């Protein structure tokens, strides 16, 4: 699997924002390829950001039922989420606003 296709995009929700700012370790969350393992995620993160993560945790989210106007329920897509923990003091700019703020300094 190509390293550029392992990490798909950042995953930003209220929960991930609170996890990121909760402890002294910065925790980043990404949607990753369903077939990627932790070693491939680590190598892709190092290739993209140039930083070595402290720990990586993954979880698989299955499709969830959603309401539709028909009698049959709809489903969301299944996804794999990677929680990447960085060492103390290491900050990574993931969102567009963070990159612009870092460049302005």
Swiss-Prot record:
GO terms (BP aspect): translation
| GO MF annotation terms | rRNA binding; structural constituent of ribosome
Query: Which region is the signal sequence?
Result: none
Q: Domain of life, per the record?
A: Bacteria
InterPro entries in the cross-refs = Nucleotide-bd_a/b_plait_sf, Ribosomal_uL23-like, Ribosomal_uL23/eL15/eS24_sf
What keyword terms does UniProt attach to this protein? Ribonucleoprotein, Ribosomal protein, RNA-binding, rRNA-binding
Gene Ontology annotations for the cellular component aspect, listed alphabetically: ribonucleoprotein complex; ribosome
Q: Answer whether the UniProt record assigns the keyword rRNA-binding to this protein.
A: yes
Subunit-level organization: Part of the 50S ribosomal subunit. Contacts protein L29, and trigger factor when it is bound to the ribosome.
Provide the function of this protein. One of the early assembly proteins it binds 23S rRNA. One of the proteins that surrounds the polypeptide exit tunnel on the outside of the ribosome. Forms the main docking site for trigger factor binding to the ribosome.
Which family is annotated?
A: Belongs to the universal ribosomal protein uL23 family.
HAMAP family named among the record's database cross-references: Ribosomal_uL23_B (MF_01369_B)
Record's protein name:
Large ribosomal subunit protein uL23
The source organism is: Ureaplasma urealyticum serovar 10 (strain ATCC 33699 / Western)
Taxonomic classification: Bacteria, Bacillati, Mycoplasmatota, Mycoplasmoidales, Mycoplasmoidaceae
